[in-house]
Amino acid sequence: MKKLFFLLLLLFLIYLGYDYVNEALFSQEKVEFQNYDQNPKEHLENSGTSENTQEKTITEEQVYQGNLLLINSKYPVRQESVKSDIVNLSKHDELINGYGLLDSNIYMSKEIAQKFSEMVNDAVKGGVSHFIINSGYRDFDEQSVLYQEMGAEYALPAGYSEHNSGLSLDVGSSLTKMERAPEGKWIEENAWKYGFILRYPEDKTELTGIQYEPWHIRYVGLPHSAIMKEKNFVLEEYMDYLKEEKTISVSVNGEKYEIFYYPVTKNTTIHVPTNLRYEISGNNIDGVIVTVFPGSTHTNSRR
């Protein structure tokens, strides 16, 4: 009897230890900001890094390409804005890792499917393991049919849904509705660590124009998801924040990122680093955002 008691006690302590380690890991997530009252060029010159920068010409088309596009009733998706790596997930077993599909016609950006799989695998390690993808990318024709069948109360016209961009997906739980499921709570608390945001939170319906959708997540990438989580921003607020601040330095878990906003009219010249990785994304309105990543790898991309 004593042996059984000690065995149960040992198992209980192991459980507590695991839970404590998980809590400790999550509590270490840290976001620190530094804003600069100057334009991007001045910041680069004053920081002594201007010799490591080069000029780059940005065209108006780039305003409508990237992971940070604001898509809503005012700013629709353009056909050229759609992610170029859309695939049928049911034909890519390597991308379906840790979650299920509602049916065999779920399409997604390959890049974002990989990010989602990484996130879900970490959730599974913590005991949250009943994720399914109910909807991913929809082309404009499919969106038009959905709008005609469902009406304005339940669907958006073609071009006005984030699903038309390839940047968003609807996530469900095989247990219950997302507002009650462990999967829904986990996403709300942790998705930002993997570059995802809950696009339509319950307390921001007046800003987004969309009712609360605990299942709809959107990829924006780090450090943007971390900033939005820390400041309780939806994408509409974040775009305004970037335009107002113009230059932001942020540390996420000790990794320093720099973010620059540039307004774009016709062909605009901006400054980018020559020795650091960076990404350029449009905002789908009137400018581009340059994100400079930690490290010294000289690669860049236009998302």
Curated annotation (Swiss-Prot):
Coiled coil: none annotated. The DD-carboxypeptidase activity is not inhibited by beta-lactam antibiotics. It is a single-pass membrane protein. Keywords: Carboxypeptidase, Cell membrane, Cell shape, Cell wall biogenesis/degradation, Hydrolase, Membrane, Metal-binding, Peptidoglycan synthesis, Plasmid, Protease, Transmembrane, Transmembrane helix, Zinc. Induction: By vancomycin. Part of the van gene cluster of pIP816, the plasmid that confers high-level resistance to vancomycin in E.faecium BM4147. It comes from the Bacteria. NCBIfam families: vanY_AFMPt. Cleaves the C-terminal D-alanine residue of UDP-muramyl-pentapeptide (UDP-MurNAc-L-Ala-D-Glu-mDAP-D-Ala-D-Ala) or diacetyl-L-Lys-D-Ala-D-Ala. However the physiological substrate likely contains L-Lys instead of mDAP at the third position of the pentapeptide. Also releases the C-terminal D-lactate from UDP-MurNAc-L-Ala-D-Glu-mDAP-D-Ala-D-lactate, a depsipeptide produced by the vancomycin resistance protein VanA. Therefore, VanY should contribute in vivo to the hydrolysis of both the D-alanyl-D-alanine- and the depsipeptide-containing peptidoglycan precursors. PANTHER family: D-ALANYL-D-ALANINE CARBOXYPEPTIDASE, PEPTIDOGLYCAN L-ALANYL-D-GLUTAMATE ENDOPEPTIDASE CWLK. Belongs to the peptidase M15B family. This is D-alanyl-D-alanine carboxypeptidase. It comes from Enterococcus faecium (Streptococcus faecium). The lineage of its organism: Bacteria, Bacillati, Bacillota, Bacilli, Lactobacillales.
